[in-house]
Swiss-Prot record:
Gene: hslO
GO CC annotation terms, alphabetical: cytoplasm
Main location per the UniProt record: cytoplasm
Compartments (UniProt record): Cytoplasm
Post-translational modification: Under oxidizing conditions two disulfide bonds are formed involving the reactive cysteines. Under reducing conditions zinc is bound to the reactive cysteines and the protein is inactive.
InterPro entries in UniProt: Heat_shock_Hsp33, Heat_shock_Hsp33_C, Heat_shock_Hsp33_N
Role noted for this protein: Redox regulated molecular chaperone. Protects both thermally unfolding and oxidatively damaged proteins from irreversible aggregation. Plays an important role in the bacterial defense system toward oxidative stress.
Signal peptide: none
Source organism per UniProt: Prochlorococcus marinus (strain AS9601)
Keyword Transmembrane appears in the UniProt entry: no
Disulfide bridges in this chain: 247-249, 280-283
Pfam families referenced in this protein's UniProt entry, alphabetically: HSP33
Name used for this protein in its record: 33 kDa chaperonin
Entry similarity comment: Belongs to the HSP33 family.
Length: 302
């Protein structure tokens, strides 16, 4: 089923709700980067987190970049997501696998804390106007959801609850997504709204299970948690907005990158190989720069 994002409000407009499905985007990233199950889940969580953040931007070309710099064996990650629902990203060590950790009598989970280690979450919000806004917070435990909640608390001072998860069955990711619930800025001093948000969130025992049981129906997922949802707040556009793994790379961007090299470097490439192959870190697309194209770059620098 196509990934998508839904926005709504509850409590008479006092609480903002956003739910996102990133299953297909995660599987596309797995295919392109050769990800393990662990790194597929981590990148899928980062996809969900970045899309949830981007959902509040007022313009469709607004973008959010999440970067994790840490000392764990994952070797960091970078995700770029837009208000338009397009997302892309990569991890430093795509093949990483770790032993599962026991979280209950008969339940096990990926060791996200060990994978990411200690470090920082860097968030860049680019509205397309002026300088991008950058903020950095320490990683809480590497499960992405709590790290994002920490960012929202420290950087935006907004009472928020973040749930991000996935479910794996028969060696495949069958659902991945997230939910963001925020008390809106004009209401963030209302103790009743904050209490309502806390009470609703306490009822979530396993977000991954709730996501799976909703059968990809994000509206049902939201309604199960916030039955007092304001139906009028859900526009047709919000109901149908798609989310997908989409990269902005192109042959022209590759040519522009090559043009940044010194003349001597271009001459060395031409002499040794007669061509160059550029690989996009975000999506692994390959672009061949041929002999004539490199020669033209050299001539233009003469």
């Amino acid at each position: 089923m196509q990934d998508r994002i839904v926005r709504a409000t509850a409590a008479n407009g006092g609480i903002r709700l956003v739910a996102v499905l990133t299953t297909e985007s995660s599987l596309e990233a797995k295919k392109r980067h050769g990800l393990s199950y662990l790194t597929t889940c981590i990148l899928g969580r980062a996809f969900s987190a970045s899309l949830l953040l981007a959902s509040s931007m007022k313009i469709m070309h607004g973008r959010v970049t999440l970067r994790v710099r840490s000392d764990g064996p994952l070797k960091g990650l970078l995700v770029d997501a837009g208000r338009d629902g397009k997302v892309r990203g990569y991890v430093g060590n795509p093949n990483l696998e770790l032993d599962l950790v026991k979280i209950d009598n008969d339940k096990y989970s990926f060791d996200f804390t060990k994978a990411l280690g200690t470090g920082y979450l860097n968030v860049i919000r680019d509205s397309g106007f002026g300088e991008p806004f950058t903020s950095t917070v320490e990683l809480v435990n590497g499960n992405i959801a709590e790290d994002l909640a920490s960012y929202l608390y420290h950087s935006e001072q907004t009472p928020s609850a973040v749930f991000i998860g996935e479910k794996i069955q028969n060696k495949s990711v069958i659902c991945s997504g997230g939910l963001l619930a925020q008390v809106l800025p004009k209401k963030d001093t209302d103790p009743l709204l904050i209490s309502l948000l806390e009470e609703r969130c306490k009822e979530i025992n396993s977000f991954s299970e709730d996501l799976f049981k909703s059968k990809h129906n994000l509206l049902e997922l939201i309604r199960n948690i916030f039955p007092d949802i304001d139906d009028k707040s859900i526009s047709e556009k919000a109901r149908s907005q798609e989310v997908s793994f989409k990269c902005k790379c192109s042959k022209q961007r590759s040519l522009n990158a090559m043009k940044m090299l010194d003349k001597s470097e271009l001459e060395d490439i031409l002499k040794k190989d007669g061509k160059a192959e550029l690989v996009c870190e975000f999506c692994k697309n390959k672009y061949l720069i041929n002999f004539e194209e490199i020669k033209s770059m050299i001539e233009n620098q003469s």
